[in-house]
Amino acid sequence: AREACNPYYDALPAIVQEYMDKVNKKIGTNYALFNYHGAQDAEHVIVAMGSVNETIEETIDYMVEKTGAKVGLIKVRLYRPFATDAFLKAIPKTVKTISVLDRTKEPGSIGEPLYLDVVAALSDSEFKNVTVLSGRYGLGSKDTTPAQIVAVYNNKDKKRFTIGINDDVTHLSLEVGPAIVTTPAGTVNCKFWGLGADGTVGANKNSIKIIGDNTDKYAQAYFDYDSKKSGGVTMSHLRFGDKPIKSTYLIKRANFVACHNPSYMTKFNMVQELVDGGTFLLNCTWSKDEVEKHIPGQVKKYMAEHNIKFYIINGVKIGIETGMGPTRINTILQSAFFTLTGIIPKEQANKLMKDAAEKTYGRKGEDVVKKNWAAIDAGANAFEEVEVKKEWASCADEGLEFKTKTEGRKDILDFVNNVQNYISAQEGNNLPVSAFTSYVDGSTPIG
């Protein structure tokens, strides 16, 4: 009986393709068991499946446009049963190297599942002499970025590798260059640092709806925070553009960064994620003359060297004056964001925000709605530009404010100072594998 089902598995790929063709005819797509994207004369092709394909596509378009790179991607639409003939037809005849990306780790195996399937499919084909490399990505929900994909295409020698992890123990990781902006021209990348329960996430969800519903722009939002959201750090990643957005990763290079909590200035690297000429908005109670002494040296240095436009706004004061209260600054900062970015004309943005506020808070009464309207009006004009002085370029790096633990058991001291502090500073993804050699069994010290 186990073997009697073979004809059904053999027939399945053709059936799936038949239904894909029906979908394609209905909505104008081109779904196939394996889709190819990239240069027609590609010499290095990635094989992958899942959301990473969007990032790879975006990177290919960037590389082909900038350098004429001969790179491509085969997207696996149907994994099981693996249709070998359809896969081979999707491969460019010019290919010399294939890198297979698996989002899994199979300890003890000679390779991950998709890699082994590709090797088997090629073994009796015209591509049997093509070099096949095996890579792992996305382990532990690590972001896969365009810079990492470029590293995959640049790799010609490392037969087994990982991306997104700095492996200084078994040395499987690829050398990754600096973050690059591969989004289509005209795409605006924005990042907001908020405090859990201050309304920042909710305001940004409203911003996405406003832009998506009232303009012709494509919109995308990711919200990054842990399960203990209230009182913790929240990060909102917003993208807007005139072309489809394929960026399935968090923003590393932003046009606009907003810090809604001034204490974050010494705790996190925020400004350093801005592109040259980007805009930084800081919510604080300091005046234009006072703010300089509260900004760490490395932040001032970066702003001076990269021509950053620096603005401050006193959301606490405005919140009190409009009756919103000192902690509900979300609407105020949202209004300032729309004015500073100009994504929507100021008057239109003002009206749309007020309509959204009425829809959101209408059930709480007219008084609450009017307070939100007042906050929107105030936030649109209350920010001030701070001069970024040339001499800031010579400021020293003061580092992040870590709470170093000095007393207690050695295992606890090591974990707090070498792992936990970096995770708290949102730098955990940069920790090397060697930082975890004492915790390979998954345990953490208790105390």
Predicted regions and their residues:
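Flexible, low-complexity linker and terminal segments
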Residues: 1-102, 107, 112-203, 334-335, ...
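Flexible, glycine/charged-enriched surface loops at secondary-structure junctions
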Residues: 27-37, 71-73, 127-133, 157-166, ...
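Short, solvent-exposed amphipathic alpha-helical segments in soluble enzyme
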Residues: 58-68, 88-92, 115-117, 205-213, ...
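Short acidic loop-to-helix transition motifs that present clustered carboxylates
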Residues: 76-84, 227, 265, 318
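Short alpha-helices
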Residues: 112-117, 135-148, 294-360
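Conserved short S/T/G-enriched processing/targeting/catalytic segments and their helical context
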Residues: 191-197, 202-287
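ADP-ribose/adenylate-binding Rossmann-like module
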Residues: 272-302, 306-310
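Ferredoxin-type iron-sulfur electron-transfer modules and their immediate structural context
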Residues: 349, 364-447
